[in-house]
C-alpha cells in the first residue's frame, strides 16, 4: 500500500515500483489524501480549472489519476476518507493552509484512523509514504508521513474497533543526493526545451546516502511510468526521457526508485549494498 498526498505524486516518485509489483501479481493499493486542488496548471487551454478561476481542478485530476492508475496496473485506488474529504493545502505558508478542509490542518488521529480502516480491509504487508520532511517540504507530504506512520500503529491496536492488522514493514520514499547530482550533470548537457536544474534543491531535498536502505530496479516498467506521468497533463510535461513540472525545470524519468526502511526486519545486506525488494524478509 502506498500513501500519497496528491494525484501525480504516485507516478513521479513511485510509478515504476507500483507498475513492477502490479505486473508481478502483488496486491497493490494506492491511497491519495487530496484531489490536488491547488496545483498549478501547465496547458493554457486548461488554465480555467485553477482554484482562483473555476475551481474544478480537483475533479479534473480525478480523471487524470484514473488514467495513471490504468497505465500502472493499479486496480485498487482510494481517496482518504472519500474524494474531497481533505483538501490540497497549497505550499507551506500559503493562505490555503488555513482552509477548513486543508489536509495540513487535519486531525492526525482522525485521518490515521481512516487510513487504518483501509489497512485492516486490505491487509498489506508493506506500507510506503514520505519521510518526515515530505520529500521537499510540502505540508501535505509532511502530513501524509505523519498520518501513515500513525496508521501503521493504529491498524494493529486492539483498542480500535474491528480486527487488528499489523503491517510488517514501513518505508519512506527516498531520493539519494548522489543520484540527483548525477542526474543534474546529465541534464546540464541535455535538458531539451526545459531549464536545466542548477542544484539538488531544484529537484528535491535529497536523502543522505546513509539513510537509504532499498533500491528497486523497475527499469522494465519505465514505459508504464512515463505513460502514467503523461496522464497528469495539467501538472507534468513529458518530453522523451525527461519531464518538468510547472517550474519548467528538467528532471529525468527514473525507473530505479529508492526507499528508506523505517520499521521492519533489518535487511540482510553487506555494508554499502541495498535491499532490492520491498517484500524482502517477509
Swiss-Prot record:
Q: Which Gene3D superfamilies match?
A: LmbE-like (3.40.50.10320)
What is an example of a GO molecular function annotated in this UniProt entry?
A: N-acetylglucosaminylinositol deacetylase activity
Q: Does the keyword Zinc apply?
A: yes
What top-level class of enzyme does the UniProt entry assign? hydrolase
Source taxonomy:
Bacteria, Bacillati, Actinomycetota, Actinomycetes, Streptosporangiales
Q: Which organism is it from?
A: Nocardiopsis dassonvillei (strain ATCC 23218 / DSM 43111 / CIP 107115 / JCM 7437 / KCTC 9190 / NBRC 14626 / NCTC 10488 / NRRL B-5397 / IMRU 509)
| Keywords from the UniProt entry | Hydrolase, Metal-binding, Zinc
> Which cofactors?
Zn(2+)
HAMAP family (UniProt xref): MshB
Q: EC no.?
A: 3.5.1.103
Q: How is the cofactor bound?
A: Binds 1 zinc ion per subunit.
GO biological process entries: mycothiol biosynthetic process
- InterPro entries given in the database record: GlcNAc_PI_deacetylase-related (IPR003737), LmbE-like_dom_sf (IPR024078), Mycothiol_biosynthesis_MshB (IPR017810)
For Zn(2+), which residues are the binding ones? 6, 9, 141
**Which family does the UniProt entry place this protein in?**
Belongs to the MshB deacetylase family.
What reactions does this protein catalyze?
A: 1D-myo-inositol 2-acetamido-2-deoxy-alpha-D-glucopyranoside + H2O = 1D-myo-inositol 2-amino-2-deoxy-alpha-D-glucopyranoside + acetate
Pfam families, sorted = PIG-L
Q: What is this protein called?
A: 1D-myo-inositol 2-acetamido-2-deoxy-alpha-D-glucopyranoside deacetylase
What is the protein's known function?
A: Catalyzes the deacetylation of 1D-myo-inositol 2-acetamido-2-deoxy-alpha-D-glucopyranoside (GlcNAc-Ins) in the mycothiol biosynthesis pathway.
Amino acid at each position: 500500500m502506498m500513501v500519497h498526498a496528491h494525484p501525480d505524486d504516485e507516478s513521479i516518485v513511485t510509478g515504476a515500483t507500483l507498475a513492477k509489483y502490479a505486473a508481478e501479481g502483488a496486491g497493490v493499493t494506492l491511497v491519495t489524501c487530496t484531489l490536488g486542488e491547488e496545483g498549478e496548471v501547465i496547458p493554457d487551454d486548461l488554465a480555467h480549472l485553477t482554484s482562483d478561476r473555476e475551481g474544478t481542478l480537483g475533479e479534473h485530476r480525478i480523471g487524470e489519476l484514473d488514467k495513471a492508475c490504468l497505465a500502472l496496473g493499479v486496480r485498487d485506488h482510494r481517496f482518504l476518507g472519500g474524494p474531497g474529504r481533505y483538501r490540497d493545502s497549497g505550499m507551506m505558508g500559503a493562505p490555503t493552509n488555513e482552509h477548513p478542509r486543508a489536509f495540513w490542518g487535519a486531525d492526525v488521529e482522525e485521518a490515521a484512523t481512516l487510513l487504518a480502516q483501509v489497512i485492516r480491509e486490505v491487509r498489506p504487508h508493506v506500507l510506503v509514504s514520505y519521510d518526515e520532511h515530505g520529500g521537499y517540504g510540502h505540508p501535505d507530504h509532511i502530513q501524509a508521513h505523519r498520518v501513515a506512520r500513525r496508521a501503521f500503529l493504529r491498524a494493529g491496536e486492539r483498542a480500535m474497533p474491528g480486527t487488528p492488522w499489523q503491517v510488517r514493514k514501513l518505508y519512506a520514499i527516498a531520493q539519494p543526493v548522489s543520484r540527483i547530482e548525477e542526474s543534474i550533470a546529465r541534464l546540464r548537457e541535455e535538458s531539451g526545451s526545459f531549464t536545466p536544474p542548477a542544484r539538488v534543491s531544484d529537484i528535491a531535498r535529497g536523502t543522505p546516502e546513509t539513510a537509504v536502505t532499498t533500491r528497486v530496479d523497475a527499469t522494465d516498467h519505465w514505459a508504464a511510468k512515463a505513460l502514467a506521468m503523461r496522464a497528469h497533463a495539467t501538472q507534468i510535461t513529458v518530453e522523451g526521457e525527461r519531464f518538468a513540472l510547472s517550474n519548467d525545470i528538467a528532471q529525468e524519468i527514473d525507473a530505479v526508485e529508492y526507499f528508506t526502511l523505517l520499521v521492519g526486519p533489518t535487511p540482510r545486506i553487506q555494508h554499502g549494498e541495498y535491499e532490492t525488494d520491498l517484500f524482502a524478509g517477509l
